[in-house]
Amino acid sequence: MRNLKLHQTLEFRDIQAPGKPQCFCLRAEQGTVLIGSERGLTEVDPVKKEVKTEISLVAEGFLPEDGSGCIVGIQDLLDQESVCVATASGDVIVCNVSTQQLECVGNVASGISVMSWSPDQELLLLATAQQTLIMMTRDYEVITEQQIHQDDFGEGKFITVGWGSKDTQFHGSEGRPITFPVQMHESALSWDDHRPQITWRGDGQFFAVSVVCSQTGARKIRVWNREFALQSTSESVPGLGPSLAWKPSGSLIASTQDKPNQQDVVFFEKNGLLHGYFTLPFLKDEVKVNDLLWNADSSVLAVWLEDLPKEGSSTLKSYVQLWTVGNYHWYLKQSLPFSTTGKNQIVSLLWDPVTPGRLHVLCQGWRYLCCDWHWTTDRSSGNSADDLANVAVIDGNKVLVTVFQRTVTPPPMCTYRLLIPHPVNQVMSSAHLGNDLAVLDASNQISVYKCDDKPDMDSTVKLGAVGGTGFKVPLRTPHLEKRYRIQFGNKEEEEDVSPLQFRFLTWIEGDAFLAISHSHSSPQSIIHHLTMAGSEGDEEQGQLNVSSSVTVDGVVIGLCCCSKTKSSAVQLADGQVLKYLWESPSSAVEPWKNSEGRPVRFARPCTQMEAAAIGGEECVLGLTDRCRFFINDTEVASNITSFAVCDDFLLVTTHSHTCQCFSLSGASLKMLQAGLCGSQVPSGEILRKVERGSRIVTVVPQDTKLILQMPRGNLEVVHHRALVLAQIRKWLDKLMFKEAFECMRKLRINLNLIHDHNPKVFLENVETFIKQIDSVNHLNLFFTELKEEDVTKTMYPPPVTKSVQVSTNPDGKKVDLICDAMRVAMETINPRKFCLSILTSHVKKTTPELDIVLQKVHELQGKIPFVPESVSAEEALKYLLLLVDVNELFNHSLGTYDFDLVLMVAEKSQKDPKEYLPFLNTLKKMETNYQRFTIDKYLKRYEKALGHLSKCGPEYFTECLNLIKDKNLYKEALKLYRPDSPQYQAVSVAYGEHLVQELLYEPAGLVFARCGAHEKALEAFLACGSWQQALCMAAQLQMAKDKVAGLARTLAGKLVEQRKHSEAATVLEQYALDYEEAVLLLLEGSAWEEALRLVYKYDRVDIIETSVKPSILEAQKNYMDFLDSQTATFIRHKNRLKVVRELKSQRPRVHVDHEVAHGRETDLFSETSSIRSGSEMSGRYSHSNSRISARSSKNRRKAERKKHSLKEGSPLEGLALLEALSEVVQSIEKLKDEVHAILKVLFLFEFEEQARELQRAFESTLQLMGTALPDIWTLTGQQSSSTPVLGPSSTVNSIMASYQQQKTCVPVLDAWACLPPKIDQRSQWKLSLLE
């Protein structure tokens, strides 16, 4: 559904050269045109408008001086830097244009009719006047010569036994004679010049020759291969014309045929059989076809026609028509009229071999015209709310309009057709009213069609794919308002212009147009502002007058208008973009500037250009024919095949067969560039896959439809997720819930978006939502899709972050909140109509309220539905069975203890009555409480079952106690009985025994104690070491003193095992009355002062000499050994860490990936403990047996959990060293209180030297560690491992090593090792008396 649009014309008038032009060729590398005349060759530069070279063939004797000579062909030879020329007299001349040297490389005595080079310029084919073909090499050596007329069909002759042919068919009463009709041959057309025509296939493997048969006088087409072997001869086609063109893609050979009432362009296959045709818009004998030409990519067929002279016709014209095909229909896209006399008479025309859309035309008056055509889609602007998404397709004198908002009609069909008197060259829609159309035809008239409420159909408007008897048109069709003729300033200038004087006709407002014309004398363009003016003589004929004109330096190749900003962007051939200010009092142009104030210039000329606002900035978007996409002067992508701007969205299709949609309102240039160039992965809302080769036709405004066209011509409608969600959000903002719901249901958008888009607004308008939907099925569908997930954060995040809304439900129970709100609204509106939806609201809650649902169904039973909208109990129950599993529903009904409800549910289910009736009958015979107990136990509702069973009486207590033990219901059971009851006593004892089995001795003791089971409580407290409670129980049991003393010694032993020496000493002193053993336990636990208190309390000063002082001195020695060991370990690890860091900074990090980052091999290495075992410092009464040995076991357990090894050269040795150093510092830090305590008793017993020695050693160790901490835990050292090394001095290896190093960064679990340990400087551990 594309049209051909003229982007640029290049014209060179009045070329100063001798003679009259006869033919021409293109010199692509030089950018010049070589024209042949009866005098010689002339090379012109159409851009600079100058004659570069003139070569006379008359002076060399190749052409006669009387001007009767003729050049039949010119071919530029690229690799030889020369030109091959053939004359009608038979000379084949090679001409070096730069040196003007001529060389005759061959001569045909009989003369040459046609010269044709193969596409690869390896073979030369000459048709002579003696009806022969001569094939030569590129070196002009004759390969072979054959007669044009061949009796044989060719190598591709069909082999058949005749089945299905005319010879074997029955012909009715006429008999057999009709089977063999007389072959009738029509002679060639009267205007046929009888010259042979030669055309090559695009790959140069075959060529076809059209020649007038010497026997029949009719034209035939013969196909030869590259080896000059005849392949096939065409079937006899009456009225076959001389024109011949082989499609470069190789599928068809085009020619013409005169039929009794029409003239067709027909197509032959390589085997000579006809394969399709299309009819030219002329009557028989009205025109003749001079030539057919395919463009380079086989997409356009140019037909050069000329009026045949008739009586009474003084003005004859010639036409160049451009035809394209789609969906097997041929469209006439352009019709360019030329004169057949004077300077505008066409001599020859050629398609450019490099640029597919460039057509070169040579006219008789030494005029050269070059037209660049590009594909465009003429669609409505889509800016107004009532825009119908019209797309107009040019087809000769018809404009095929498809209204995509109402129907998707595949081409070549359409919604309606506009009939124009002359072939259409351009169609445009109004920038403000997209349904209004203006059509420019080949006679430079503009037909304006407007859509209004007129009931009558216009005679020039015909319905297309719709219609019929009684059919009512569901849309407003346009009517012809008036036709306007563009008025020129000079009548002579009007007759002496190129066929398309005005280009880029743009309808900017109701009565104003913009158009572009070019200057013939200089590279300038003129922007015309055209306004409508009525005609006094004819109401149906108006005029377009030029109200103002602005001259622009440069060739304009693009013009677009933005209706929102009323800005017009003008693109020049050099890529510069200008802004045309047509609303200003004096029309002017200025450079289009970007946000930085720099003029915008495309790097390459763009064939499609549009203006749009991106993030509030007005930008120009351009797409080149090489798929490069620009926004202002920035190339954002190089794989874009088509794009369209609709509302606030930019849609593009790419070479990777995707369609991407971007919101422009909150977008930026960098974001679009990142999304299009693939530097960031587009979200699912932005990107969707499309069929290979899809191109955007249009986007339906205020809708979700995106129309794509496939390469073969068929259409596909897709609903791009971004467009869908944007439209749904608009509907929800306007409280148009029904439209949003229908769209979401049809396109399978999660219905949670209705609430999540704006929860507060939805909950405030629940009644509006229900009234608009007004369908029980649709409401139920909405309920079934509800979930706690916020889809605006997961599935459908908004393109622009919206303002944070206060949560309407801080507990996160979204589903419950919606169900409750909608249920209240439905019960208010019409509870009978929405009965099923109300039931669904109960079922869909987080905890389904099946009991309430069953109760409501039970209430419906027995009611007669008088109202038509009411629902019976049976219908409600059937519906519930769709939502809930039948077994679950049966169980819930059983849990209501209502057997009528249970039977109703069971009857509607698939259950066998033999299964449930005996069970229900058994239950009915039971006592009420026991019945409910049995039901709850069956339903595994054990707490309720226990409650009912406890009410059944003492005779059921044994069963009750078994239930309590089986289901661990002790806490619930204790709430059901009085504390003074025997049942409470029995449950408590069972509970305590259960806790003992679980090794929870202290809670078990408390339970036993509360219920009076003191002996069991004593055992439990004794097992857990709770000596206070154990002694309390002993008192309540009134135990004898000796038993109490034995109990105390047992408790003391357990406390010692738990390293609670002070508490063990208290028990021995107060309950076992053994103060001596108590003192020894205190000395073992380093409680020096408490031990002295007992010594003096019981006046046993002798113990000081025998036990206290030796223990103190032993402890001091152990402390000194421990400090020496830890200091040496600290220094050794610190020095090794320094070495490790130096090696790490020196060695390359290229192979770091091969290291074991997670310590998988560390189990193979031996671990080195940094703390000595307690046995090295043990003494009989020293604290090392308790505290230091406990620390050693703790370190061993920690070492077992460590992943890092201290072995030299291990992968993470540095981290292991940090861990070891941190442990040393922490162990020293924890000794401060202990050192302070022993310093006091050392001073007390006059061991001042030992005390000072210990104090100095401890202070020295602390200073050593405090000084080394900043060097060990350095900030730069930690950052260097994770910061990539970048910069001008970096290399590939260094950058890779830096990034690979980040892979081995410290795991989260080991991050504590990178933090320096804390040393409390405020701790007062010193003894000032020793200083």
From Swiss-Prot:
Record function comment: Component of the elongator complex which is required for multiple tRNA modifications, including mcm5U (5-methoxycarbonylmethyl uridine), mcm5s2U (5-methoxycarbonylmethyl-2-thiouridine), and ncm5U (5-carbamoylmethyl uridine). The elongator complex catalyzes formation of carboxymethyluridine in the wobble base at position 34 in tRNAs. Regulates the migration and branching of projection neurons in the developing cerebral cortex, through a process depending on alpha-tubulin acetylation. ELP1 binds to tRNA, mediating interaction of the elongator complex with tRNA.
Compositionally biased tracts (Basic residues): 1193-1205
Keyword Phosphoprotein recorded: yes
Record PTM text: Phosphorylated.
Localization terms from the record: Cytoplasm; Nucleus
Protein name per the record: Elongator complex protein 1
Pfam families cross-referenced by the UniProt entry: A-sol_ELP1, Beta-prop_ELP1_1st, Beta-prop_ELP1_2nd, HB_ELP1, TPR_ELP1
Comp. bias intervals (Polar residues): 1167-1176
Any GO BP annotation: tRNA wobble uridine modification
Key words, A-Z: Cytoplasm, Nucleus, Phosphoprotein, tRNA processing
Residues modified as Phosphoserine: 803, 1170, 1173
UniProt subunit comment: Homodimer; dimerization promotes ELP1 stability and elongator complex formation. Component of the elongator complex which consists of ELP1, ELP2, ELP3, ELP4, ELP5 and ELP6. Interacts preferentially with MAP3K14/NIK followed by IKK-alpha and IKK-beta.
